[in-house]
UniProtKB/Swiss-Prot annotation:
GO terms for biological process: methylation; rDNA heterochromatin formation. GO terms for molecular function: N-terminal protein N-methyltransferase activity; protein-lysine N-methyltransferase activity. The keyword Methyltransferase applies. InterPro entries: EFM7, Methyltransf_16, SAM-dependent_MTases_sf. It comes from Debaryomyces hansenii (strain ATCC 36239 / CBS 767 / BCRC 21394 / JCM 1990 / NBRC 0083 / IGC 2968) (Yeast). This is Protein N-terminal and lysine N-methyltransferase EFM7. Belongs to the class I-like SAM-binding methyltransferase superfamily. EFM7 family. S-adenosyl-L-methionine-dependent protein methyltransferase that trimethylates the N-terminal glycine 'Gly-2' of elongation factor 1-alpha, before also catalyzing the mono- and dimethylation of 'Lys-3'. The gene is EFM7. It is an enzyme of class 2 (transferase). It is found in: Cytoplasm. One of its GO terms (cellular component) is cytoplasm. Keywords: Cytoplasm, Methyltransferase, S-adenosyl-L-methionine, Transferase. The lineage of its organism: Eukaryota, Fungi, Dikarya, Ascomycota, Saccharomycotina. Its EC number is 2.1.1.-. S-adenosyl-L-methionine binds at W57, G84, A85, A86, D106, W138, S165.
Amino acid sequence: MSDDEFIDTGLFAEPEGFTPPPPPPHFAKYQRKNKTDPAELNLRLVGKSPLWGHLLWNAGVFTADYLDKHADELVTGKDVLELGAAAGLPSLICGINKCNRVVCTDYPDPDLISNIQHNFDHCQGLDLSKTVVKGFIWGADAKPLMDDSEKEIQNEDKFDLVILSDLVFNHTEHLKLLKTCRDTVKKNGKCLVVFSPHRPKLLENDLEFFRTCEDFQFKAEKIDLVTWKPMFEEDDESIDIRARVYSFFLVPQW
């Protein structure tokens, strides 16, 4: 009898319906450029997410840098909303820079939301009483983001700044994103929109967001276009385009 006859080849097979556990969370360090305290933020990222919340993207870093640099104008004493926050880095920077309140949102996936809350709970220099972390679906009723009471929302209940960092690649969601911006930003506020072209062939679809915004009574004002090290250097296709980081303000015209 051969040795093979004694081997149960199904011994280590996964049972039917088995789902492997998700990868464990990992950490990424963000270094503030202005060297003020805290000089470094240690961000926990989810192990894996179909919503791409497991990566610290260039657009998020650029957004954080920009808000830190222009905090006196955009952040300090202001009401701030972030959409699609992933690890919540821009919101954390707003909190550290003494915003009046920051509401940090992402898709209501429990892993994503609990991970953002973890980063808030472990961030040095943050006044948690002025922060809210919650799930939100773009285009939905935005009133719960601003006020939980029954009163009608007024301009003063809305946000001075709405942050959209690396969201415009969701081309099917442009109208919902813009509706939420229209519903939540103050007449004298603005939206900060930052993105990198992850799919170079669809760059024009990304940029369509800044034309469509006019239908919602916004004017797009370009802030900057910089070139950074791309996220995935092993992908040689159109590396010069993927290295770009675009930034715009959407300014209300109503």
